[in-house]
From Swiss-Prot:
Intrachain disulfide bonds: none
Gene name for this UniProt entry: MDR1
Name recorded for this polypeptide: ABC multidrug transporter MDR1
InterPro entries: AAA+_ATPase, ABC2_TM, ABC_trans_N, ABC_transporter-like_ATP-bd, ABC_transporter-like_CS, ABCG_dom, ABCG_PDR_1, ABCG_PDR_2
PANTHER family: ATP-BINDING CASSETTE TRANSPORTER (PTHR19241)
Organism, as annotated: Trichophyton equinum (strain ATCC MYA-4606 / CBS 127.97)
Database matches in CDD domains: ABCG_PDR_domain1, ABCG_PDR_domain2
Function: Pleiotropic ABC efflux transporter that may be involved in the modulation susceptibility to a wide range of unrelated cytotoxic compounds.
Amino acid sequence: MASQPPQPPSGQPDTQYEEYQSEVITETTNRPTPAADVYEITPTNDVMDDRYEHEHDDYESGAMYETVRTWSPQSRPELVRIASVFSRIDSHPDVAPTTEDGGQLNRRDTLAGVKIGDPVLDPTKPEFDFYKWARMFTHVMEKEGIKRNRTGVMFRNLTVLGSGSAVQYQDTFLSPFAAPFRPGELCGKGRNPEKVILHDFNGAIREGELLMVLGRPGSGCSTFLKAICGELHGLQKKKESIIHYNGVSQHTFKKELRGEAVYSAEDEHHFPHLTVGQTLEFAAAARTPSKRVLGLSRKDFSTHLARVMMSVFGLSHTYNTKVGDDYVRGVSGGERKRVSIAEIALSGAPICCWDNSTRGLDSATALEFTKALKIGSQVGGITQCLAIYQASQAIYDIFDKVIVLYEGRQIFFGPTRIAKQYFEEMGWYCPPRQTTADFLTSVTNPKERIAKEGYENRVPRTAVEFERYWKQSQNNKLLLADMDRFEAEYPPEEGHLEKLRETHGQAQAKHTASKSPYRISVPMQVKLCTVRAYQRLWGDKSSTIATNISQIMMALIIGSLFFDTPQTTDGFFAKGSVIFFAILLNGLMSITEINGLCKATDPIVPNAQRPIVVKHVNFAFYHAYSEALAGIVADIPIKFLLALVFNIIIYFLGGLERSAAKFFIFFLFTFITILTMSAIFRTLAAATKTIPQALALAGVMILALVIYTGFTLQPSYMHPWFKWILYINPIAYAYEALLVNEVHGNRYRCATPIPPYGSGTNFACAVAGAVPGEMSVSGDAWVESSYDYSYAHIWRNLGILLGFLAFFYFVYLVVSELNLSSASSAEFLVFRRGHLPKNFQGSKDEEAAAGGVMYPNDPARLPPTNTNGAAGETAPGGSTVAVIPPQKDIFTWRNVTYDITIKGEPRRLLDNISGWVRPGTLTALMGVSGAGKTTLLDALAQRTTMGVITGDMLVNGRPLDSSFQRKTGYVQQQDLHLETTTVREALRFSADLRQPKSVSRKEKYEYVEDVIKMLSMEDFSEAVVGNPGEGLNVEQRKLLTIGVELAAKPQLLLFLDEPTSGLDSQSSWSIVTFLRKLADNGQAVLSTIHQPSGILFEQFDRLLFLAKGGRTVYFGDIGKNSETLLNYFETHGAEPCGPSENPAEYMLNVVGAGPSGKSKIDWPAVWKESEESRHVQQELDRIQSETSKRNEGHGQSAEKEPGEFAMPFTSQLYCVTTRVFQQYWRTPSYIWGKLLLGLTSALFIGFSFFLQNSSMAGLQNSLFSIFMLTTIFSSLVQQIMPRFVTQRDLFEVRERPSRAYSWKVFLLANIIVEIPYQILLGIIAWASLFYPTFGAHLSSERQGILLLYCVQFFIFASTFAQMIIAGLPDAETAGGIATTMFGLMVTFNGVLQKPNALPGFWRFMWRVSPITYTVGGLAATSLHSREVKCAQNELAIFDPPSGATCAQYLQKLVEAGAPGKLYNPMSTSQCQYCPLSSGDQFLGGSEIHWSDRWRNFGIGWAYIVFNIFATVALYYLIRVRKSSGRPNRIISVITYHLSQFGTYCRAFITGRKEKCPRKREQIGKIY
């Protein structure tokens, strides 16, 4: 039956509308006059604001302040500017502060009974009170006449558009070939269509108000906040949309006052190596005003301000702790979130928008954060908007207004106190104990909302109907009237803009443009960022030192490689090589400046810090080019010192001329080259959006720079189509300058005169530039003849280099400023082609899909309120959960203790915890932040890899066996999945490998379909997991995580770690109720839960509550309406829990959770002595006794499935290899990137060395072309390792602990899958390089051998990459090691320094380098038996003695077996002798022989086999052995107790014998 268009209920009381109208009118007409200048706030227990009354008026509900508005609109004080007053008074107690007009502020002046010197005003004291501090701050600021900006915001007809569709298709390796058959997509038709994200929003937020933004994920909350702050980045507003700040348009406001409206994103971006104190002091310093109270210095002001915010947000103890990230150890996740909050607070912006900033915070901390926002709004007039997903009633009551979003449509905007009544009068039912915020969000969820009886056909259903109802409501009319008054009060661009400019100008430093949004000048910004750069370097000094040491080691190696180079013509090639090495290593060491993978772990890397710079630019901390310039300034001294040490070593050890003048020229050019290449790499990083883009371009650029330096390919041999690269190559100019600098003015003794017995003018030196009859060769003549270089070019080249340097630095600064933002797009699902569900629509009617509304008289549809609690027998999608196999096993743990050692100091994480989980029960694991909830879960699930665990863990009274982990499910907090797999494939993979082999594949897949129905995943079962924003959303990922564990059919129990983390209230409700259904069907469930609402909390049967230090506070039943739990706490001295209070929040408050929470009662000690604790021990004894008897009765016939894995090795290998093949096939960017790298590099090399002639230089160039092919090796390795890490992370974090498959299978599968693609790559490189370079004249045998070598080389590269990354933690570390090893292999392969010229202690490196055999085999096959035809400058030209022919004169030389060839034997003058006659003679100088081709090929395969075995061995030794095995655990226990020997002895001596280890309690049974 079609529903009627919803209308506002005409028969409903309109008292709320009258009250709202009177509030708006009162607020507008009763505004204070400019004469008053005091803003008073007095504590009260009645109401938070005289305009809005609340149902809950206790302290915890946030109703704690009454506002008397007597401030002046022109002089409302700033919230965070008074801190310096207290620091001055505390440090100089005898100095009375003076005001701007010279008057004194008496030290005994008080405000509401608070003295300035009170410890409650000192953020370093435990008595500090932010509320009182802020009030006194206001008072002093008013006295000194310092103003701050304040403004509200009004938005009318706000519509935001984005690009993207609700669904896209997954690309595969063949997608580019299929594109021509889809012309619509190829031409852009139907691709990235315009999508309306926000529809026609209206509202007004006055200064000092708090707005709560509610909506489900994807409803547009983040976009709304970004629109308010003007941070849309790629999204667009409609022309009709209006946003203004007290009359100032958003365009003008963002241009001149950008930092006055800031947006706090949900993700945290900080420099991990900075401490919390450094991070916040930087933020404070960047926004420190020019006019400060008492004239304090900027440093004192910013330091004190940072201390205040650290105290407010509970960060004082982390002042000297690194912020950290996923890779760098630092503060906890919750503390890092608070750092982000404090950073925003320090910006001093009058408009702040917070996007789910309470995520990851426990309820007590989230409440304190919201209270701090309220104080800021009331005292400082800050306008704040906060999007929040799980808000308690106490948090909700703090807000002034609320906006509710439904699929991008506004369905309510108004005071928080009338919102609930509005929706109830609409016809929706709010269950008891459901918070108002949850209720408001639930009405947007068809699966959760409940219609009142009699309203079933009157309530709106779709988002459009809700919006229509809102626009026709009286509340909307009052809102529009209030907006009209707002606009009348603040006419566009009249007056208020000048006031804002005036106040902003007062805060600006000298030499800052008046219309600049920044408070400090550019030089101050550069200085501040430079100091921060050095702080980051110091914080990561180990990495900096390691990098510098590696560079110095390379200098020592290269220098020693050319040690004692002869000062003869035989040393010409060596001199060119060492200078080539020096200039390349100096220039290319800066490539690390485009590394870091956007994690900000590299101290001065542009791309790594981009998200942080973008954030700070939006906060108006500094210009992006200021940070870029600071990076340059900070980097120059470090580069100078490193270059000095590096070049001293390589210059003097490498045999270059020991002349002070030449050394300083050498150093000058190398240092300028370092800076120039640094500027180029920085520009490349700044101009690209992602690290892979930058690295891909850098790889191509480096190849071009190396080839066209002038050494590997001499200028005269360059082809015109690429020769232009020589003229834009900075390294080429530096190489020419260094080479001519070295040989200028020198003469070198001829090492090979032709003939050696010649005299007078009857001989010549077989070197370019030689003069007949001279026994030495001029260095200037040699470089001019060989390279066309001239000493006259040296200073010209310096000028060109400086020009390059200035140009690229300028471009870098410009690009850094302009290329910051990234485009935003709408979220979408990704499906495999041909697998889109038939009923899937991009914008479907969720109401219809959910089967209509819910009714309050249907018990099966009501949220359960009892502890038995199933909400009927249907899962979220209505399917049964009866497929869960029944369970009978009881898991118990007793006196579990977990100790680890940190920096040599022991630390106890879990302290004698006991409990159990029965089948059919849902047990909650809760605790304060840092209590060890996840740690306990990991310990119970046998997933810890370090430390010592003691205690008893039993299943049915028996010790855990090797099958325990595969018989349990563990839902991790992080939703880790392979991004290329579909939902159904992920579930089938889990079922295939984790269900017993006795179950057929058909049965497994049928069970997977049951799981899909249980979790209501039918609509996206064929969707690809993808990445956030391009794939499954947060809720769908969490469902998949749970589904993967259910698909394994856990026989014992199901562990869950924070299954509701990051979800909105309705999604959390869906997850927890599903767990309730699982428990009701016999599943044993143990779940940690972070911030449960009262209704969610009542779904659990039992609770294990932990305090800090992993100590038990409570373990037992929760009881109906939480009576058992509450009775325990109240019996032992806690305040009674209010009837409307959330028991979960009550518990946290009782034990003193939150940054400033304290409890007078030691609850863990109370528990230890309680009757309930003794009952737990008795019950454990009883359970163990009963299960032991039952085990004895069954004897050895009890059901048991021994074995670590459910499936045999071959089945594991088949499944895993198939999945890895699938992953590669569905990652076309990786495969095509690999193939294009090989194709473009090989073609570029081939056409650079196109058809080289048979001269000696031509042969050398041909050898260099083969050498250049091997340089692809490094880029290939860098591509492979991140792919391996992705697979390994998933395996080690989820699949190995679950015992899905063996680590040996994981390694073999990854090795196997790479091989076909490496074979294809070898074929492409072979065809692209060797045909252009050597032509098609080679025999088929030789071409076949070349192909085999190419394929072998690329297979070696893949196995080498896997060997290096196998045991290392991340791709960055492995990349550094691989690059170093590759450098050694390339250096010692006999091309750049002939083997016979190597110092004796380095010859072994030539023999062990794998590249030696690859180059040897390729070169021998390519150049064997090739006739040498010397170029004119390569010939030894001389006259024979009078009367003799050339042949007669050289007869002795020929008879002695000289390798050369005489071109004019019958001539009597100008004999032309070529030193070589065949390619084999040329190769022989590098000890490359045609006869060794198959030996070299065999050695190559030996290296591949070695790589594979080494991969397995390294992975086992580093990543398997250390984390598994009983002997290692025993060793850990012994080591731990030995480390505690001194402690035990001291305790014994002092009589504290209880500290000594007791056999049972402290050692226990080792697992």
